[in-house]
Amino acid sequence: MTRTLKPLILNTGALALTLILIYTGISAHDKLTWLMEVTPVIIVVPLLLATDRRYPLTPLLYTLIFLHAIILMVGGQYTYAKVPVGFEVQEWLGLSRNPYDKLGHFFQGLVPALVAREILVRGMYVRGRKMVAFLVCCVALAISAMYELIEWWAALAMGQGADDFLGTQGDQWDTQSDMFCALLGALTTVIFLARFHCRQLRRFGLITG
């Protein structure tokens, strides 16, 4: 199957993420929280490198995964409630809490939705754009819900030690707003990125028609 990115670009991106991973790990506020936050990056990056020839993804998806990985690693470094740029946005918008975690949950909907869309469209598993859009949003929300369950299990297992990982900042509706942000990310995929995504799929011969 034709590669969608030159090996140099893909390997450079992977190297950059590896260096950021090492740096954020060394300077992490809490090593256990950092490890819990960056585990998806540790799993996904080697997987993408291993499947580059057999199942290359669109450049759009590679780019968004790259950005999401950085968001996760920065969140793990400082903990989401203490990311400096989040405090700047909080002050600028007059918010009551650091909103950086909401950016993370937005990408938690955006990226899985695009992954699901790419798999469904390329495999021709579903007919009809509306059904694809519906299933893509369902997948993103399911992943978001699973993450909230993981946070709950962490809270049960670690008690107050899980506070940095949970990052609720005293918000009683944190779980619901997290999932809403993930839904907004998924809707961004199906409303604003779908057409461009299809153009890339056709351009690289990943779909026909």
Where are these regions (language model features)?
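Membrane-interfacial alpha-helical segments at the cytosolic side of multi-pass membrane proteins
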Residues: I43-D52, F107-M124, A157-Q160, F180-F196
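Interfacial helix-loop-helix junctions of multi-pass membrane proteins
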Residues: D30-W34, V85-G86, Y100, S144, ...
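Internal alpha-helical transmembrane segments of multi-pass membrane proteins
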Residues: M124-L141
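Residue-level signature of transmembrane alpha-helical entry/exit and packing/kink sites
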Residues: L10-G13, E37, L61, K102, ...
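Hydrophobic alpha-helical membrane-insertion segments
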Residues: T63-L72, V136-Y147
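N-terminal membrane topogenic signal
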Residues: M1-L15
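"…centered on the first transmembrane helix and the immediately adjacent amphipathic helix/loop
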Residues: A16-L110, L114
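Membrane-interfacial segments
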Residues: D52-Y55, V83, I119-G128, A154, ...
